[in-house]
């Protein structure tokens, strides 16, 4: 069987709806680092593990590979501009953006749908990405509507008409 070309694969993957997160850490100069991702997923409840992946060409890769901690902010539907900002090639994504710090000092955003503070547990080679697994050391959630991403666009969840 032939492998699909990257354009077809990308189009097929865009059919899968995901949540939108900003993953953050602190670099070795004490500066906050963050990026938008939709590769976030749960791995295990016992122990509590989550994963996300990062392109090997990312300027943030070294900081995430070297860190002991990272945080994940699951964005709410009100945070589409924040998602776009942290996905853009901006030099200082945190400039003018309000955020708090987790107990380990990782940047976290207010008004998220949920958040996870993690210790960096494992890293795996995943083709053109590195897969990061984190052990959740604290988390929280709100009642806000989560931001979704599908077909190359942001969206919000809506009940299916048959169950609404």
Predicted region positions:
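Basic, polyanion-binding surface patches
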Residues: 1-164
């Amino acid at each position: 069987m032939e492998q699909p070309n990257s354009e077809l694969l990308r189009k097929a993957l865009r059919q899968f709806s995901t949540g939108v997160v900003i993953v953050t850490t602190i670099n070795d100069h004490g500066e906050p680092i963050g990026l938008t991702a939709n590769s976030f997923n749960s791995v295990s409840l016992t122990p509590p593990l989550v994963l996300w992946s990062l392109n090997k060409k990312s300027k943030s890769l070294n900081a995430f590979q070297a860190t002991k901690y990272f945080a994940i902010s699951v964005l709410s539907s009100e945070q589409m501009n924040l998602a776009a900002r942290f996905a853009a090639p901006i030099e200082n994504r945190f400039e003018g953006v309000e955020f708090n710090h987790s107990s380990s000092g990782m940047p976290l955003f207010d008004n998220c749908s949920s958040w996870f503070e993690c210790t960096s547990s494992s890293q795996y080679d995943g083709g053109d990405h590195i897969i990061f697994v984190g052990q959740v050391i604290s988390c929280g959630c709100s009642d806000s509507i989560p931001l979704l991403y599908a077909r190359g666009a942001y969206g919000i969840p809506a009940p299916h008409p048959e169950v609404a």
